[in-house]
Amino acid sequence: MFGEDSDVFRVRVAGEFPKSTPDSLIAMEWCEKATQLEIKTAKLRIDIGIDVARYGDDSSVLYVVFDKQKSGEIEMHNHNKTTEISGYAVKMIKRYAAAYPEASIHVKVDCDGLGVGVYDNLDEQKERIVQAVWEDRCREAGLDPKDGNQWRDCQDVPELDLHIVECHFGGAGGKVDDDDPIEYVNSTGLMWGAVRQKLKD
């Protein structure tokens, strides 16, 4: 009933510390193993998640994931207007567009509250962001996008593939997959279940 991999065996027989608590959703051992993995990523897709807190005790967070596999930098900002958070997002988009010109960028904004203002602002600015990134790329290639004589050459410079996505994290739950014994009540629980499954695998 309690094999060598169980915490009962570890504590009572081997005299070791348990690897998880009975009520843990995600075992610490899985997290520790996951931090040791080296994930090579082509950086063809960049997701930027934005959770807006505005003036509360919480922080607004911008979080980057490459190819749905590897985390990038985390930016945290306190006591900012939604327009300021939009500005931080635009800077981040431009920074990653310059560093990874072949990547598509998907900005996912939590719109279950204050984030809807950031979403609206970014969605409204989308064409201007794409244009500004394209002009920067032209200049990087030694071209002047404002010079009519270089217009034809500038057309060979690729535009940024940018997506602004409205997300709602309080939605319906379900199972991570058909074999999952756990039915999650909402999308937040489902998200944690997916993380748990990835770490377990």
State where each predicted segment sits.
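ATPase catalytic-site recognition across NTP-hydrolyzing enzymes
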Residues: 1-50
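Charged, alpha-helix-enriched surfaces in structured cytosolic catalytic cores
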Residues: 4, 8, 57, 186-190
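Short coil/turn motifs at helix boundaries and re-entrant loops, enriched in small/polar
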Residues: 6-7, 54, 115-118
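Residues in well-ordered beta-strands of folded domains
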Residues: 14, 63, 165
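Short, flexible loop/turn elements at secondary-structure junctions
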Residues: 17, 52-54, 111-113
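Generic structural signal for beta-strand residues in well-ordered domains
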Residues: 40-41, 55, 100, 157
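Gly/Thr-rich phosphate-binding beta-strand-loop-beta motif of the actin/hexokinase/Hsp70
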Residues: 41-66
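Mg2+-dependent endonuclease catalytic cores in nucleic-acid-processing enzymes, primarily RNase H-like
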Residues: 68-201
